Design a protein with these regions (language model features):
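Hydrophobic helical h-region of N-terminal Sec-dependent signal peptides
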Residues: 9-17
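C-terminal motif of bacterial Sec signal peptides marking the signal peptidase cleavage site
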Residues: 18-22
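Bacterial N-terminal signal peptides that target proteins for export
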Residues: 1-9
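Lipid interaction determinants
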Residues: 24-86, 97-144
């Protein structure tokens, strides 16, 4: 009987622990991505120029009163920091997915974005694994 009570105690403790742990809300994800005054991230998001050359992004997220949506700027560059193009976008997080609505009508979706330390992770809708690094300051791109 003592053994059964012991197992019941363990089972109830596990259930209680699981019920108190929850998934991150859209607002929490948004704040992790945009911070209080905006955050800039750098890395590869799976984009290429028309000739197949990889493009890297300096992408800045800012939010207003609500941290689950806001506006942003993306500077796509070549690896040597030569500027390819600058894009403006609106962004929002819905049900854990990050939607970027570019001013040219293109929508880019990042599934289950997360922030761990100085890194932003997510999966693009085409399966590309995104890993961006947080950079101090709003834009550190070398002006070539």
């Amino acid at each position: 009987m003592k053994i059964v009570k012991h197992y019941w105690f363990i089972a109830i403790a596990l259930i209680t622990m699981i019920s108190f742990s929850s998934c991150e809300s859209d607002e929490e994800r948004g704040f992790d991505i945009s911070g209080l005054y905006g955050k800039t991230w750098w890395g590869e998001m799976g984009f290429e120029d028309p000739y197949g050359e990889r493009l890297y992004s300096y992408i800045t997220f800012t939010s207003g009163a609500f941290p689950d949506h806001g506006v942003g700027t993306e500077e796509r560059c070549y690896y040597d920091d030569e500027l390819y193009r600058v894009y403006k976008f609106d962004w929002e997080i819905q049900n854990g997915w990050l939607y970027l609505y570019y001013s040219d009508g293109y929508t880019f979706i990042i599934e289950y974005p997360s922030v761990s330390g100085r890194y932003f992770y997510g999966t693009a809708e085409d399966g590309f694994e995104i890993r961006l690094e947080w950079v101090d300051g709003r834009s550190i791109r070398k002006k070539v």
